[in-house]
Amino acid sequence: MCGIVGAVAQRDVAEILLEGLRRLEYRGYDSAGLAVVDSEGHVARLRRLGKVQVLSQAAEEHELHGGTGIAHTRWATHGEPSEENAHPHISEHITIVHNGIIENHEPLRELMIGRGYRFVSETDTEVVAHLVHFEQKQNGGTLVEVVKRVIPQLRGAYGMVVLDNRDSSVLVAARSGSPLVIGRGVGENFIASDQLALLPVTRRFMFLEEGDVAEITRRDVRVFDKSGQLATREEIESKVSYDAGDKGAYRHYMQKEIYEQPMAIKNTLEGRFSHGEINLSELGPKADELLAKVEHVQIIACGTSYNSGMVSRYWFEALAGIPCDVEIASEFRYRKPAVRKNSLMITLSQSGETADTLAALRLSKELGYLGSLAICNVAGSSLVRESDMALMTKAGVEIGVASTKAFTTQLTVLLMLVARVGRLRGMDAQIEHDIVHGLQALPARIEQMLSQDKLIESLAEGFSDKHHALFLGRGDQYPIAMEGALKLKEISYIHAEAYAAGELKHGPLALIDADMPVVVVAPNNELLEKLKSNIEEVRARGGELYVFADEDAGFTSSENMKIIPLPHIEEVIAPIFYTVPLQLLSYHVALIKGTDVDQPRNLAKSVTVE
């Protein structure tokens, strides 16, 4: 959600800022803007409603010279999408961009109006601009000193960058609940909400921690921690590919990322097998001692990550014999959970910056959990830094808002973790052997399945005029049905719901008619005969069935039942495998409906506010 880019350099930075915004478009936004300050303190600000391309075209018509600047893509929270509400916001010589939500903006707005300030937008960000201006006018000091005095007045989440056009040599950044990363250059430095924005200009990064305030000049970066003391933050060399944001020959990022899944899973497995066993030595030398004590697993996540957690619940209990609960982060953090003895908290997040998941992790430290383990796709993210242990998915950068390869690599890591914990609890060695064999075969199996893309594309037309869809699964395929429904609603805007197939008689059956497509995932397992009975219930009521079935499951297509035969797959990896055709189905339905596949309306890739 929202994107920030800033630069302090000896060269003109407007194009650096615009390119950074282009590389952040995946985060979701409705307007964009930038401000550039030249050496004489003249500010040039441009803001436009709509895409970054609109802003870029406007920039070509203006003189945007200057070595210091900030830019922003806005996802509307306070105030409608409009040019007036777009960032940057200005209060005389103070210019600011901001991600997050200032919860006490209304009383602060009244306070500033009482002090004689006039507001030209509906945003909470303009409040902060006026606060900084007032504080500097009243009490003086350097910009970083002023920002440090303003921060205690703010309640909520923010990642902000401030400049004072009277001193164009410095930017000040502050982070609380919304990520910021500093890019180090030679005689120039940068800041952004995601390192991807800065890869064209640097590969050296420094991640700000919670409560940090940073003073950024061309030659130096000073970081102050939440106590106001000078702090050192580790500088890392990014391994993210420069062209990670390139679609290549694919029409959409989502399509590219679906097809990247075999390689993403290979990368995630690399180095994690040893002598036919799962090797997770990256957890550290004390991990086995801690994991051997685990008597319960609590998984916390949001969205697609929640669905992967739901799958792993079946694995933890059936394979490792450990009770497991899965909860939505935004629910967990606002109740009073009774923590079980020796419970391990596992958090799941693609970005590692999901606001509710981070808040739940921080809460867990007060509740007496045995330890915390993050499964994440972004090294150096807040979730990784703040957890006791971390396992990285190695999916590579995921741009499409609708998660694909991050989901399947999360499941891959979770299954490896189940095997590792299970071994410590005396799990049958044959089970781990089956998991290892299944995971090693998985990339090739998915490659084989992707060859069915044209067949799946031919089914999409049947959804083009539908307003609702139902997804059914049983056992560990029920969360896969949930994920399939989520994908369809995210990118095609068709209302889709998922149910455990055994629940049909308890309500959903009332919805079945000829206008209700019903998608079923049907691997050849011990629940197949039960599932066939559920399918017959739908057929008897005229529902239009689309059954993704094991080729050995004994299904044949009929007038209102289309069978999509899939290769037989080892049961332990079937949930990962059956995810992919549902991703393809959703993608092709969205193409037919003409929606914005990579940036669906009202959604953002990284949900960094509550």
From Swiss-Prot:
PROSITE patterns: GATASE_TYPE_2, SIS. Pfam families: GATase_6, SIS. GO terms for cellular component: cytosol. One of its GO terms (molecular function) is carbohydrate derivative binding. SUPFAM superfamilies: N-terminal nucleophile aminohydrolases (Ntn hydrolases) (SSF56235), SIS domain (SSF53697). The keyword Metal-binding does not apply. Keywords: Aminotransferase, Cytoplasm, Glutamine amidotransferase, Repeat, Transferase. InterPro entries: GATase_2_dom (IPR017932), GFAT (IPR005855), GFAT_N (IPR047084), GlmS/AgaS_SIS (IPR035466), GlmS/FrlB_SIS (IPR035490), Ntn_hydrolases_N (IPR029055), SIS_dom (IPR001347), SIS_dom_sf (IPR046348). Its EC number is 2.6.1.16. This is Glutamine--fructose-6-phosphate aminotransferase [isomerizing].
